Amino acid sequence: MEKSNNYKQQWLPITKKETDRLGWDYVDVVLFSGDAYIDHPSMGCAVIGRVLEAHGYRVAIVPQPNWQDDLRDFKKFGKPRLFFGVSAGAMDSMVNHYTAARRKRSDDAYTPNGRHGARPDYPTIVYTKILKSLYPDTPVIVGGIEASLRRLSHYDYWADALKPSILLDCKADILVYGMGEKPICEIAKLIESGTKISDIKDVKQTAIIVNKSDCPKENDDSNLILNSFENCLNNRIKQAENFKHIEIESNKWHGKTLWQTANNKCVKVNPMNEPMTEEEIDASFDLPYTRLPHPKYNGKRIPAYEMIRHSVNLHRGCFGG
C-alpha cells in the first residue's frame, strides 16, 4: 500500500470544518456508517477509510447520520469524486436493535453513552435510498455484515419472511461482501480510470444486479445457478439447497460465480478473493489509526470501544467461524 501524501491529521474528517482545515476542495469517497467513528482496526469503516487513504484518496466519514431531519448529514460533503460507501456497522442492525424474542433493546454498544436510536432498522437500505434520491448519478457501494449476509435470498427472522437480495431493496450499484479492502480499492481504481459503474461486473467478492437475460442457462465449471427467489419462496427446501451451495462456494479458494433470479432480475455474486497474505493483513493493521473515538464525542463512553481499547487484532472475521 502506498501511503497518502495528504495525511495531515489524526482522524479521517467527519465534518466540513475538518476538510476545510485540510484545504480540500473535494472528497473522493464519503463513507456512511451506522456506528460511531472509532479509528481502530477492529472497526470496518475505519479500515476501509484508512486503506483508501493509503492509496492516495481523500476520504470522509459520516458516522450515524440523521435520517429523520432535513438530511443535512447526507449533504454536508456534497457529491464525492468517486463514490459513496455505506455500511450498517460492525453488527447487523436487527441484532443490534432487537432481542431474540423480537423485543426492542434499550441500548446500543456502538453509540456514544450506549444510546439507542442513533440508526434506523436496515441502515444499508435507508442510507442508500436517501443517497440515491439526492445524488442519483453517483455510485453507491454497500458492504459490511448486514449487506454481506443478505447478498442473496435470505430468511429474515424479525420479519419472519424470506427476502430477496438486499441489492433489490436498496438499489445500490455494487455490494462488497466479506473483507472489503481488495474489492473497494479495485472499484476505486476502475472508477477513477473512467470505467462506468455499470461496466464493473467482474470484481471478485462483489455482487451486482444484472438483467435476467444475462444469467447463464446452465451450470458449468465457473458458474452455478441457484434456485430462484420465487422457487425458494414456495419451497423452503430450495432455500436450504441454496444455502448449502453458498456456504461451499464461499469457502473455496477458487469458487464459482453464483447466479439467482429474483423479481425479473438476476443477482450475480462473483467468487471470493484468495485469503489475504501475512504482508497484506499486516499492512492493513499498520495504517496510522489513532485507536481512539473521534474527538467530537467529547469523552462520551462508547461501550464497544471500552471492550477493544487495549486489544491487539490477531485475525480477521469471526474467530469462531
Language-model segments: residues:
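Catalytic cores of nucleic-acid editing and processing enzymes
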Residues: 1-5, 9, 32, 70, ...
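Local cysteine-cluster metal-coordination motifs and their immediate loop/turn environment
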Residues: 313-321
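Glycine-rich beta-alpha loop elements in corrinoid/cobalamin-binding modules
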Residues: 36, 44, 63-264, 269-273
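Acidic/glycine-enriched edge-of-secondary-structure segments
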Residues: 1-6, 55-58, 109-120
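Short helix-loop-beta junction
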Residues: 47-59
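N-terminal [4Fe-4S]-dependent radical SAM core
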Residues: 2-26, 36, 244-314
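Short strand->helix junction
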Residues: 37-38, 319
